[in-house]
């Protein structure tokens, strides 16, 4: 089994992106699966194109894209991606689409095809904070998640999803007091736990993780 795991390059004035910093520290094998690690640009155009190119090149069984969610207290396993780009800040190419579809005429949304609840429980079982999320935002993270799910929708052999990670502790300088973060080693270990859960669970858990907000 091959797992393609991607992380973004730095954006928004940050010197690092904990997504790729953690991804590149992952072991080359998790639960018997080969881990293929790639960096992709934080760009609506180039990021989506690169992840599709990597899928074509690597022919993975599983795709897990990883992005930074500054302000998150732990990992967020994303359940849904929407066909909308509404960028609060420009991407790394200076593009700032507002209220634009990612794929004109495409589905309004796609659900992750990974066992998202099993991933949450797998990370929590290792002692790391993690929750199920029902919005991947409207920036490049959502764009990549949507594009991947749109690309693999006709191939049931490939399952895909997205995880957001918090700031690394090394990014806290200059940020407001109380801004949550995790040590980079912990982010990496939590990602490994999420991947292990994906490899070991072809179907998801049947338990309540809904929200009222």
Residue ranges and their predicted role:
Residues 1-136, 149-157, 177-213:
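N-terminal catalytic or cofactor-binding beta/alpha core of small enzyme domains
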Residues 140-149:
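Hydrophobic, aromatic-enriched interface-forming segments
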Residues 160:
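Glycine-rich phosphate/pyrophosphate-binding loops
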Residues 164-170:
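An accessory alpha-helical subdomain
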Residues 172-175:
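Short conserved micro-motifs at the rims of enzyme active sites and ligand-binding pockets
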């Amino acid at each position: 089994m091959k797992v393609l795991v991607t992380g973004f390059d730095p954006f928004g004035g940050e010197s690092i992106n904990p997504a790729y910093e953690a991804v590149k520290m992952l072991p080359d094998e998790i639960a018997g699966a080969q881990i293929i690690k790639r960096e992709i640009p934080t760009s609506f155009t180039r990021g989506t194109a690169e992840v599709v190119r990597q899928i074509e090149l690597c022919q993975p069984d599983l795709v897990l894209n990883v992005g930074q969610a500054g302000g998150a207290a732990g990992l967020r396993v994303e359940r849904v991606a929407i066909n909308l780009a509404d960028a609060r800040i420009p991407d790394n190419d200076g593009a700032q689409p507002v209220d634009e579809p990612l794929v004109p005429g495409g589905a309004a949304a796609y659900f992750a095809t990974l066992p998202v609840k099993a991933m949450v429980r797998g990370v929590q079982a290792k002692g790391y904070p993690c929750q199920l999320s029902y919005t991947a935002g409207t920036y490049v993270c959502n764009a990549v998640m949507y594009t991947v799910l749109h690309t693999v929708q006709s191939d049931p052999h490939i399952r895909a999803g997205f995880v957001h990670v918090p700031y690394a502790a090394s990014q806290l300088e200059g940020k407001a007091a109380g801004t949550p973060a995790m040590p980079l080693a912990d982010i990496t270990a939590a990602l490994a736990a999420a991947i292990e859960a994906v490899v070991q669970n072809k179907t998801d858990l049947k338990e309540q993780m809904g929200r009222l907000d």
